[in-house]
Each structure stands twice: as C-alpha cells, then as structure tokens.
From Swiss-Prot:
The lineage of its organism: Bacteria, Bacillati, Bacillota, Clostridia, Eubacteriales. It comes from Acetivibrio thermocellus (strain ATCC 27405 / DSM 1237 / JCM 9322 / NBRC 103400 / NCIMB 10682 / NRRL B-4536 / VPI 7372). This is GTP cyclohydrolase 1. One of its GO terms (cellular component) is cytoplasm. Pathway: Cofactor biosynthesis; 7,8-dihydroneopterin triphosphate biosynthesis; 7,8-dihydroneopterin triphosphate from GTP: step 1/1. Keywords: GTP-binding, Hydrolase, Metal-binding, Nucleotide-binding, One-carbon metabolism, Zinc. Zn(2+) binds at residues 76, 79, 148. Toroid-shaped homodecamer, composed of two pentamers of five dimers. It comes from the Bacteria. Disulfide bonds: none annotated. InterPro entries: GTP-CH-I_C/QueF (IPR043133), GTP-CH-I_N (IPR043134), GTP_CycHdrlase_I (IPR001474), GTP_CycHdrlase_I_CS (IPR018234), GTP_CycHdrlase_I_dom (IPR020602). The gene is folE. GO terms for biological process: one-carbon metabolic process; tetrahydrobiopterin biosynthetic process; tetrahydrofolate biosynthetic process. It is an enzyme of class 3 (hydrolase). Its EC number is 3.5.4.16.
Length: 187
C-alpha cells in the first residue's frame, strides 16, 4: 500500500528544496493533500486489472467490439507529470466470448493509475484482454497530451502522442487493421 507518511515527508523536503517555506499558510496542508492524491492517482499499483473482467458467452459473435474515447489520465514515470487523453479499445471475439463494455474502461483506468509510459499502457491493456478472453485480435490506441512536453523542455502545448498496441488478427491482417483504424478515426 501507499506510505502516506513517507510521501508527506518527501513533499515537505521538496518544498524546502525549491526554496519554499512548508510552514506558511498556503503550504501547511500540502504534504497531506499530495499524499491523499497519490493514494487516488496511483491506485492501479495495488489492483489487478483482471479482477474486474466479467466474461459472457454470446453465441457465434465474432464481429468487432469497440469502445472509443475512454477518458484517461496517467502520470509519466519520467517526470511525474500527467498525460491526459483518450483510449480506444477494439477486440474481435473468438467463439462468442465477450467482455462487458464497462470492463474495458475499468481495465484502462486501473492500468493508467500508476507511474506509466503511454506505450506500455496500451500494451498492458491489450495483454489483459488477450489473456482474459483470448479474442481473435485486439487493438488499443491511446492519444494523449503529455504535460512534460507542455510545461517544460520543448513546451509544445496541444501536441498529442498517439500509440497503438495490436494483437492477433488486427496486427497480422492489413485489411482488418485498416478497418479498425478507419473506425477509430471515424471514417
């Protein structure tokens, strides 16, 4: 679990390190606030995304299932700044084995709630779906703005990073992959 006391002590030291007075009125409760925030935004560190999976059997359904524009936020593990965007999750069931739609969003949420790389986030989501229901194929496309590119360094506000994780037939069959990307892009 998260050690709130260590987080509070570290935040206090950070404030001192940047030249702030952690005992001034506006900062007095900041260490506690940050510790509580960490408990929430890093909750995925202590959750198994497979624990939310619920599998249904829908006779002979082998057509694409897509949930688009799932809002996401995560924390870039390089700078501990947020990246915010959307995830699109697509899978093609095998022999009618399907997953509840809300479970796709829950998997994304759990995996995003930890220090993360966008590339790994999509890959981990795809792997959980593959391992849970063994579909014919999975695609996870993540579009996000990274505040480490907006607030520091290159300072390119509004730029988006797009990553994809493809598995099964969606990776190996060009026509299927093109259909998935067209659906994601609204064409």
């Amino acid at each position: 679990m998260i050690d709130k006391e260590r987080i509070k002590a570290a935040v206090r030291e950070l404030l001192i390190g940047i030249g702030e007075d952690p005992d001034r009125e506006g900062l007095l409760e900041t260490p506690d606030r940050v510790a509580r925030m960490c408990e929430e935004i890093f909750a995925g560190l202590h959750q198994d995304p497979k624990s939310v999976v619920k599998v249904f059997q829908e006779e002979n359904h082998e057509e694409m299932v897509m949930v688009k524009d799932i809002p996401i936020y995560s924390i870039c593990e390089h700078h501990l700044l947020p990246f915010i965007g959307v995830a699109h999750v697509v899978y093609i069931p095998r022999k009618g084995k399907i997953m509840g739609l809300s479970k796709l969003a829950r998997i994304v949420d759990i995996i995003a709630r930890k220090p993360q790389l966008q590339e790994r986030l999509g890959s981990e989501v795809a792997n959980v779906i593959m391992e849970s229901i063994n579909p014919l194929g999975v695609a996870v496309v993540v579009e996000a703005e990274h505040l480490c590119m907006t607030m520091r360094g290159i300072k390119k506000a509004g730029s988006k990073t797009v990553t994809s994780a493809l598995r099964g037939i969606i990776k190996t069959d060009a026509r299927t992959r093109a259909e998935v990307m067209a659906l994601i892009n609204g064409r």
